[in-house]
Structure formats: structure tokens, C-alpha cells
Regions:
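Beta-strand-enriched cores of mature, soluble protein domains
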Residues: 20-132
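Sec-dependent N-terminal signal peptides
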Residues: 4-13
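Bacterial Sec-dependent signal peptides at the C-terminal "C-region" and cleavage site
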Residues: 12-22
Length: 132
């Protein structure tokens, strides 16, 4: 299974309950991946990749994630940490790396803004920084 490194930088909007200046170091163990090869054979625009897994902090499971990418178009992701989540969306070109905008969240991340950078590597790592 392909693995990704993800760095989340979150700007806390007014009313966001999570403390600004907080940094969370998370890792993901991918539990599923599905690939739909649309159009031209092999990876090409319009193909759909869906994957997700369990999210850990200091070796303890704290949540899960789900990511759906359309090659050459958009990538939509949601990372749940406890009862709260972060939502990110953005353009993803062919290849393992992209940057997306954090467009909101739920619970203590409600109103969150920032960016998420994704780079393909052997393991998935999340770094969440709350600033504001």
C-alpha cells in the first residue's frame, strides 16, 4: 500500500476551542486503499484513489482518516482526532505530492483554517500546528 506523509498547519479562527500554538505529532497506519483506473490505462487524470487508516499519537490510537483523490483534479480529506475533525480540500496533480487548504473542522477544530502538505513516503506522518 502506498503511504503518505502529511503536515497539517492550522490557523485557529475566532471561536476555535483548540489552543493556538499547539503542535500534534500524529502517524497513520493505512488500513485500506482502493484505486479506480478510469480512461487511459495506468495512472491518469480522472482516476480515483480512496484510502484511510488509523491515526496514532505517541503509539496510542487517537482517531482515523479518510482521503479521496481524483488524479488531476481534487483531493478531499477528513482526519478525526477523538470527537473532532479537520477537513482539507485541494488540487492534486499526477504524483504523490500536493498541498491542500484546511477548510474547516468539527468540535474543537470548528472554523479551522490552514494548509495540509502531502508527500509520498514509506509511512504517513501528520504534524498539526494550531496558530492564530
Amino acid at each position: 500500500m502506498k503511504k503518505l506523509a502529511i503536515a497539517l498547519v492550522v490557523l485557529a479562527a475566532p471561536g476555535v476551542a483548540a489552543a493556538s500554538g499547539t503542535t500534534l505529532h500524529l502517524t497513520e497506519k493505512q488500513t485500506f486503499q482502493q484505486y479506480v483506473d478510469n480512461g487511459a490505462k495506468g495512472e491518469s487524470a480522472g482516476d480515483i484513489r480512496t484510502f484511510g487508516g488509523d491515526v496514532f499519537q505517541s503509539g496510542k490510537r487517537v482517531g482515523h482518516d479518510r482521503i479521496r483523490c481524483v488524479v488531476g483534479a481534487t483531493c478531499n480529506s477528513q482526519v478525526w482526532i477523538g470527537r473532532s475533525s479537520l477537513i482539507a480540500n485541494g488540487f492534486v496533480a499526477k504524483g504523490p505530492s500536493f498541498t491542500a487548504k484546511i477548510t474547516g473542522g468539527t468540535g474543537k477544530y470548528k472554523g479551522a483554517r490552514g494548509t495540509v502538505s502531502v508527500v509520498g513516503v514509506p509511512t504517513t506522518k501528520y504534524t498539526v500546528r494550531l496558530v492564530g
